[in-house]
Amino acid sequence: MLRGVLIPVITPFEEDGSVDEGTLRQLVDFYLQASVQGLFALGSSGQGPAMSAVERKHAAEIIIDQTASRTPVIVHVGTADTPTTIELAVHAAEKGAVAIGVIPPYYYCDAPDSAIIAHFREVADAVQLPVYIYENPKYCGISISPQLGVRMKEEIPLIRGMKVAYGAGAMQDYVKLFPDDVSVFTGNADIFGLVPFGVAGMINPPTSFVPELCVELWQSLDRGDYGVAADLQRKVNTVTQIVIANIKRHGRGTVAETFRMRGISVKRFPRWDTAPLPPEASAEMHRAFRDAGILE
């Protein structure tokens, strides 16, 4: 079972919108040097839903190849339809992913539970890989409640994990109701009060440019050093607040700027056109990180 910090890898793009292979490989090495416990590819931060199936396969191949089995890779393969999801899942399995992430089939968000379960069952049957439910109702319009999650696990034994992107209040219900062979990860940054009660770790986008800090936090919690963990959690919370505030004000180009601050020249992110972060906003953000002791 996976535990720890699984990084939601961003997919960097060239100016023409194609996948920037060189920078993506650089990002993988950056995360491996930080000793993260795994990579979560092509979810929301990975821009999977904004890419074609061909592009998603290409990005998955790059990530898995560059990782070279040095850390587990979960590839998110979810789409609005079952055949394409299966196509991406089969590809991920063939290339060496250890598991797949699957968001419920979005757009038709009035689908009954039976249709959602059928979708997940068909995907699982096609690949025989561990399946991680991607619970992200903000973007997909469908929520997998703890009760539905348990029913899905009963009918689909290959379900082995879940990323709960926006359900902090229900985290302990997921942990309590799922059997022990299901790892529950939070998409939030505040894990101090969750890991001691069974949450397996974090898959948090805003902090993905400071993986060392996240790994330190996880390790301190895992060994029960709660004094150190409390200090690290405050830093992680500060990072999250600064990044989210800038995303709300200036858009997702903020994310590219955070990586540039770490020496990784992300040319284009997100996939779509977005105004660059104003120089004064970038300087202010960097100053805030420096004042908090997060970056030099």
Residue ranges and their predicted role:
Residues 1-7, 11-141, 151, 275, ...:
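Active-site beta->alpha loop and helix N-cap motifs at the rims of alpha/beta catalytic domains
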Residues 1, 174-176, 259:
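Catalytic cores of TIM-barrel enzymes
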Residues 15, 21, 53, 146, ...:
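Alpha-helix N-capping/helix-start residues
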Residues 6-11, 34-36, 198, 206, ...:
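C-terminal alpha-helical cap/extension of soluble enzyme domains
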Residues 122-126, 137-240, 244-247:
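Catalytic alpha/beta core domains of metabolic enzymes, predominantly
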Residues 24, 56, 60, 85, ...:
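A general structural signal for well-ordered alpha-helical segments in protein cores
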